[in-house]
Curated annotation (Swiss-Prot):
Gene Ontology MF terms: ATP binding; metal ion binding; peptidyl-prolyl cis-trans isomerase activity; protein tyrosine phosphatase activator activity
Subcellular localization: Cytoplasm; Nucleus
Disordered, as annotated region: 343-398
Location, primary (coarse class): cytoplasm
Compositionally biased region (Low complexity): 363-388
Native source species: Drosophila melanogaster
Record has Cytoplasm as a keyword: yes
One Pfam short name: PTPA
Reaction(s) catalysed by this chain's protein: [protein]-peptidylproline (omega=180) = [protein]-peptidylproline (omega=0)
Keyword Magnesium: yes
Family annotation (Gene3D superfamilies): 1.20.120.1150
Record-given protein name: Serine/threonine-protein phosphatase 2A activator
Length: 398
């Protein structure tokens, strides 16, 4: 267990890594944690459709407290500036920041959590501590991002965040986490953990592409073929997570976008953002959640439990293309009655030419869908997006 995270008095469930060998991967994919995670990701995608990151959205007092926690962690970066050292990657000052973070987090969580939720402090602290990278290797990757997804999902399962927080948890809290993660990457020259280079979606992140494509699934002001255009990036980088990611990539990498980010470049061939979202979720399940080198480092506890789901339990889907998804397709985390309300943006998206999206697009499930696309790694320079049958002709890149 991470140093600085101490159990309070009383008997608490053990928090431990459960995936010890390849045989455990099948157990993981049938676990309650796996199903809750997919439900949370897809439910959030359904909830944030058509809502910009900069829109006025509801922020509860608890969510504001969580945002202030990140302000405190950011101050630690100022207090631990990078050292002058000969090696290009892995500034050793990151280890000082990580140690300070581990020492401060228990106090921050103690102050933040109400008394009836303090029993979850250890588990929440474990997930959050693991969200910022590895202090030994001074690297960061999608496994650390996954730990933060466990943290977010746990906040809802413990009812620390409520149904009304589903939109702001993604567009405010996750976005704030993303800002700090990028600051750490730049300040300490952190190496990407487990990146496949040009054939990976991104060196560091994955989920902001999923949720960012969901934001654009209705009333998008531009179609997918345009997201690499400089004018689009400049205008919309603050409004959509997907474009924020593209902007960050363009700042840290040089050369033609199709050469250093081939997977993302191939997405410009996909006709709708809803299909992009479906393909990205499938890719996330295959390339991140199904990889032993990633999941062997994941911790499980009471909130994100390794216990199996009932036989026949299916993964929840995201059904995009509707501003108000049907109740059966909304998020379900832990218990069937944890369902978020239909989001209402107080500031509607600007009038713009909308994508032509069918009302029933492919589900983001583990099963194949006639209207989804599949993204897969390739060793060739051909497109990495395989459209399903009947998806229609793909537009050519300009």
């Amino acid at each position: 267990m991470a140093s600085g995270i101490n159990q309070a008095a009383g008997k608490l469930p053990a928090i431990a890594k459960k995936v010890q060998n390849l045989g455990d991967m099948g157990v993981w994919q049938k676990s309650r944690a796996f199903h809750d995670l997919i439900g949370y990701i897809n439910g959030t995608s359904s909830a944030i459709q058509g809502i910009k990151t900069t829109d006025e959205i509801f922020e509860s007092e608890m969510l504001k407290k969580l945002l202030r926690l990140f302000d405190a962690l950011e101050k630690l970066v100022e207090q631990n500036p990078p050292l002058e050292q000969p090696q290009r990657f892995g500034n050793k000052a990151y280890r000082d920041w990580a140690q300070a973070m581990r020492e401060l987090l228990p106090e921050l969580l103690e102050q933040l959590l109400p008394d009836d939720k303090k029993r979850y402090q250890v588990e929440l602290g474990q997930y959050l501590t693991e969200s910022f990278g590895n202090a030994t290797r001074i690297d960061y990757g999608t496994g650390h991002e996954l730990s933060f997804l466990f943290f977010l999902c746990s906040l809802f399962k413990a009812e620390i965040l409520q149904e009304r927080d589903i939109v702001s948890a993604a567009l405010r809290l996750f976005n704030r986490y993303l800002e700090l993660a990028r600051q750490l990457q730049r300040t300490y020259n952190m190496e990407p953990a487990g990146s496949q280079g040009v054939w990976s979606l991104d060196d560091f992140q994955f989920v902001p592409f999923i949720w960012g494509s969901a934001q654009l699934a209705v009333k998008s002001p531009f179609d997918p073929s345009k997201f690499v255009d400089e004018a689009i990036i400049t205008e919309y980088k603050d409004h959509f997570m997907f474009i924020s990611c593209i902007d960050y990539i363009c700042k840290v990498k040089t050369g033609h976008f199709g050469e250093h980010s081939n997977q993302l470049w191939s997405i410009t061939d996909v006709p709708t953002w809803a299909k992009i979202n479906a393909g990205l979720v499938k890719m996330y399940q295959k390339e991140i959640l199904s990889k032993f080198p990633v999941i062997q480092h994941v911790y499980f506890g009471e909130l994100m439990t390794f216990e199996p789901v009932s036989s026949g339990t299916t993964l929840s889907n995201a059904r995009l293309g509707h501003v108000a998804p049907p109740p059966s397709k909304r998020i379900c985390i832990g218990t069937p009655n944890l369902v978020p309300p239909v989001p209402v943006a107080t500031a509607p998206p600007p009038p713009a030419e909308s994508l032509s999206i069918e009302q029933n697009v492919g589900d983001s499930s583990s099963e194949s869908s006639d209207n989804s696309v599949v993204l897969r790694p390739s060793t060739s320079s051909s497109s990495l997006v395989a459209a399903a049958e009947g998806s229609g002709d793909k537009p050519s890149k300009e």
